[in-house]
């Protein structure tokens, strides 16, 4: 199959003309629709990118806000713990001071009671010794004793004193 140069040029002109006609028809009837679709698609992509950027920024803001709140909560918890420790230390100091004061009062009261009991015991013993001395002196005077009888009488009264 031989193709001549004239046929080739004719085919070339026909194909080129058909292509130009196709471009003109596309430009007249479909080009605005095609470019509209591409523009809508480009706008949608740009809008999606903008929304994604806004969402990322909001997420960063929320993350920072949560981080700040967490730091604030930690600081507040630390303050509460420190206040509780201070309150506990103050309570401990107050309780110890009250206990020492109460112990001092109890010790002082016990010492006073001991001193009072000692004074009462001494007065009682002095009274009994005085009574015994008077009684013994009366018996000695009423009885004229020799030294041996005198010693026996004193021993007898000492034994009675020990039993009382």
From Swiss-Prot:
It is found in: Cell membrane. Its main location: membrane. Induction: Induced by a decrease in external pH from 7.5 to 5.7. InterPro entries: ATP_synth_B-like_membr_sf, ATP_synth_b/b'su_bac/chlpt, ATP_synth_F0_bsu_bac, ATP_synthase_B_chain. The keyword Transmembrane applies. The chain crosses the membrane at residues 6-26. Pfam families: ATP-synt_B. One of its GO terms (cellular component) is proton-transporting ATP synthase complex. GO terms for molecular function: proton-transporting ATP synthase activity, rotational mechanism. Gene3D superfamilies: 6.10.250.1580. CDD domains: ATP-synt_Fo_b. SUPFAM superfamilies: F1F0 ATP synthase subunit B, membrane domain. It is a single-pass membrane protein. Keywords: ATP synthesis, Cell membrane, CF(0), Hydrogen ion transport, Ion transport, Membrane, Transmembrane, Transmembrane helix, Transport. F-type ATPases have 2 components, F(1) - the catalytic core - and F(0) - the membrane proton channel. F(1) has five subunits: alpha(3), beta(3), gamma(1), delta(1), epsilon(1). F(0) has three main subunits: a(1), b(2) and c(10-14). The alpha and beta chains form an alternating ring which encloses part of the gamma chain. F(1) is attached to F(0) by a central stalk formed by the gamma and epsilon chains, while a peripheral stalk is formed by the delta and b chains. F(1)F(0) ATP synthase produces ATP from ADP in the presence of a proton or sodium gradient. F-type ATPases consist of two structural domains, F(1) containing the extramembraneous catalytic core and F(0) containing the membrane proton channel, linked together by a central stalk and a peripheral stalk. During catalysis, ATP synthesis in the catalytic domain of F(1) is coupled via a rotary mechanism of the central stalk subunits to proton translocation. Belongs to the ATPase B chain family. This is ATP synthase subunit b. The gene is atpF.
């Amino acid at each position: 199959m031989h193709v001549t140069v004239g046929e080739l040029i004719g085919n070339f002109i026909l194909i080129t003309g058909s292509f130009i006609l196709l471009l003109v028809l596309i430009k007249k009837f479909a080009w605005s629709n095609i470019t509209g679709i591409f523009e809508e698609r480009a706008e949608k992509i740009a809008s999606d990118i903008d929304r994604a950027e806004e969402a990322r920024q909001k997420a960063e803001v929320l993350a920072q806000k949560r981080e700040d709140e967490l730091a604030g909560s930690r600081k507040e918890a630390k303050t509460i713990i420190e206040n509780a420790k201070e309150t506990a230390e103050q309570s401990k100091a107050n309780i110890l001071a009250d206990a020492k004061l109460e112990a001092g009062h109890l010790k002082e009261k016990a010492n006073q009671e001991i001193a009072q009991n000692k004074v009462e015991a001494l007065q009682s013993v002095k009274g009994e010794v005085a009574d015994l001395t008077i009684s013994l002196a009366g018996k000695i005077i009423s009885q004229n004793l020799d030294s041996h009888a005198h010693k026996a009488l004193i021993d007898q009264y000492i034994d009675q004193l020990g039993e009382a």
